[in-house]
Amino acid sequence: MSTLLIGDVHGCYHELRDLLSLADFDPARDTLWLTGDLVARGPDSLAVLRYVKSLGDSARLVLGNHDLHLLAIYAGISRNKPKDKLTPLLEAPDADSLINWLRRQPVLQVDNDLCLVMAHAGISPQWDLTTAQRCAREVEAMLASDSYPFFLNAMYGDMPNNWSESLSGLARLRFTTNALTRMRYCFPGGELDMICKDAPEDAPAPLRPWFDLDSPVREAGYSIAFGHWASLEGRSTPPQVYALDTGCCWGGTLTALRWEDRHSFSVPSRRASRHAKAE
């Protein structure tokens, strides 16, 4: 039995199946963890969602910012843009079923036996694991409720950027959503910077990648796996932190990490060239 962690798929269905074949993934035996952003930019988001949904309990995923944006489009809150290549999914006969399944997926995965945490963008350095789990459950409950369009309409925005237990309502939910699905850089005190998308070597002072700040989660012995940040190309992270987005939808690769022995697998994108961007 293996635990296979895979970075952002972004609609790259054929690469996903290539990678699972390379890693000898068997859903009857193994468990697949996905860092989110299953959809958008790649050519076949519909096939990706159908396949991952079909895996049932053999797949554990977290929602990414593009997955949340898909929910907002389907709810009529955001506009469907051609560059996202989502029209076949939005017009599919099983779209309702797929969307309702997707909005009931978590934004945080924790396995205490593996000492492993997964979130699309990472874990705020201002949080311990208990706080992260509590905040994630609040967002998940809202997404699963009949009020989810109200939340999706209010989730866009960069503030507040500083965690406090006194945060409440939509402000609290927005901070959690940004920390788990959009974060890249923080100020030295752990406050979120939602502007910079540069590679770490080009980021202006005093910004630092979130994983370069002290982390109560890592200090408690947990490792953190995340996606979202393709320009890292899986590198530049400290021990216990695993960056898995290697830019498949931009012409890079799709990467998997087998947790038990930390062996990595990758397959090339079927797209002709790499145009790495931060999204």
UniProtKB/Swiss-Prot annotation:
Entry superkingdom: Bacteria
UniProt xrefs under InterPro entries: ApaH, Calcineurin-like_PHP_ApaH, Metallo-depent_PP-like
Principal EC category: hydrolase
SUPFAM superfamilies, alphabetized: Metallo-dependent phosphatases
Disulfide links within the chain: none
EC nos: 3.6.1.41
GO molecular function, one term: bis(5'-nucleosyl)-tetraphosphatase (symmetrical) activity
Reaction catalysed by this enzyme: P(1),P(4)-bis(5'-adenosyl) tetraphosphate + H2O = 2 ADP + 2 H(+)
Alphabetically ordered keywords of this record: Hydrolase
HAMAP family found in the cross-reference section: ApaH (MF_00199)
Family, similarity comment: Belongs to the Ap4A hydrolase family.
Stated role: Hydrolyzes diadenosine 5',5'''-P1,P4-tetraphosphate to yield ADP.
Protein name in the entry: Bis(5'-nucleosyl)-tetraphosphatase, symmetrical
Organism expressing this protein natively: Edwardsiella ictaluri (strain 93-146)
Lineage of the organism: Bacteria, Pseudomonadati, Pseudomonadota, Gammaproteobacteria, Enterobacterales
